[in-house]
Swiss-Prot record:
Membership in a protein family: Belongs to the invasin protein D family.
Originating organism: Burkholderia pseudomallei (strain 1106a)
This protein's record includes keyword DNA damage: no
Protein encoded by which gene: bipD
Name of protein: Translocator protein BipD
Predominant place of localization: secreted
Gene3D superfamilies for this protein: IpaD-like
Coiled coil listed as a keyword: yes
Coiled coil stretches, renumbered: 127-171, 250-299
This protein's UniProt keywords: Coiled coil, Secreted, Virulence
GO cellular component: extracellular region
Function: Required for invasion of epithelial cells, as well as for survival within host cells, escape from endocytic vesicles and subsequent actin-tail formation. Probably regulates the secretion of effectors BipB and BipC and their final integration into the target cell membrane.
Amino acid sequence: MNMHVDMGRALTVRDWPALEALAKTMPADAGAREMTDDDLRAAGVDRRVPEQKLGAAIDEFASLRLPDRIDGRFVDGRRANLTVFDDARVAVRGHARAQRNLLERLETELLGGTLDTAGDEGGIQPDPILQGLVDVIGQGKSDIDAYATIVEGLTKYFQSVADVMSKLQDYISAKDDKNMKIDGGKIKALIQQVIDHLPTMQLPKGADIARWRKELGDAVSISDSGVVTINPDKLIKMRDSLPPDGTVWDTARYQAWNTAFSGQKDNIQNDVQTLVEKYSHQNSNFDNLVKVLSGAISTLTDTAKSYLQI
């Protein structure tokens, strides 16, 4: 089947498995000018960097623990290294910038290379798939911007929760060898601050709201105008589980509360982990898209040159 037909169908319906298959066959169809993984990395598009940084942030969050009493001995909680989350956001932002720059370069090559080869007067009609490719590049840039904005916002939220979890041990202590004291009111105030300052993100103009709602699930809500808001339900459950300041619980009751409270923290982690996995999948789709686009540009340019030689 003609590569252009296959590609047009795959791009129109966003059939990423089909694009992946096309990317694998591109060397046979488009000569030696298709973009390789090494080319992507040379252009600064190395998905491993942001994904490793995000993985480190998830690991850091997972390592957080509340103070506890184990075998009769009080054990301090573990605080987070918050710079890990900053590093992840910087990596996501830098990777998105490199992806966008690469698409803009391909767009220039597509419009300049194929049309300029045909001459200013346009001796031939543009390939029917040309406008489709331009549209796909535009959609690709929109998706990059959206994912970068959302992942950055979720990472900031993740960091805020990690900060609260780190401060918990300042308000939890051993009353004696059988009881724990918890200043729940102060912890409530910390959690409420996070709820009151949850980051909001804006999808790019023209984004498919229904598609993004399906993509992101119930960890966030998306308004009809494309405003993305983090679902605070898990934080609210954590806040509402807390007792007043100065509460004393025996070890069994404290541990039961700790288990439920930490369970909500784990649920937040799962939400972010799921988004990071989707972000990784999006990066894989991007790599395959670029390989297909670069091969198509090579083919279209060769076609234009061949026409002029007739």
